[in-house]
Design a protein with these regions (language model features):
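Canonical hydrophobic alpha-helical transmembrane segment
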Residues: 52-68
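A short beta-strand motif that forms part of the nucleic acid-binding face
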Residues: 81, 88, 153
Length: 173
């Protein structure tokens, strides 16, 4: 029997600054590859071989931007369970049984100040899964540090967690 999904959100990196840096860095290798390998020029004062440049171009010029493009954070709320999947880092979703959550609240936070940036982060306020923005839901557990789930739809996530906890307690009664 398939479980009811109360909330699902898939987020990608949207920060213009991040994409500017990634694409500018990749562009350097695109220029080098085109100039040296395709146009038979010499790129730089101490050029590497065409094969070496082709390998570095593939990694930095193609796979690095593709890696950031494919990276995503999927959050799902099911009855009694929160699942977080940060692709490509997680092979399986991180499952958080909501019965272990003492309390939770919708928060506005500073990604850089509180957690040191975006992604899977550990900061002075605990662990965070976030992709962009500064809103989310902070989960406080009975036996461990807080967990922040960043969301572009933090209010909906909060409501779904509340509903999932209520559904689980009704099912267990």
């Amino acid at each position: 029997m398939a479980e009811t999904v109360l909330f699902q959100e898939k987020q990608r990196f949207r920060q213009l600054g991040l994409w500017t840096v990634v694409l500018a860095f990749a562009a350097i290798f695109w220029v080098g590859f085109v100039y040296q390998v395709l146009l038979s020029g010499t790129y730089g004062n101490n050029p590497v071989s065409d094969v070496e440049l082709s390998v570095v171009f593939a990694v930095v010029g193609v796979y690095l931007p593709l890696f950031f493009y494919k990276m995503n954070l999927t959050t799902e709320v099911l009855p009694g369970m929160l699942q977080v999947y940060f692709s490509p880092f997680h092979l399986n979703p991180v499952r958080v049984p909501l019965r272990l959550v003492r309390t939770y609240e919708k928060v506005v936070y500073s990604p850089i100040g509180d957690y040191g940036g975006w992604g899977i982060r550990w900061g002075r306020k605990g662990k965070a899964y976030n992709m962009s923005g500064n809103e989310g839901v902070e989960l406080l557990f009975y036996n461990k540090k807080p967990l922040l789930i960043g969301s572009q739809r933090a209010h909906e996530l909060y409501q779904a967690i509340r509903q999932a906890k209520e559904m689980k307690s009704e099912i267990g009664s």
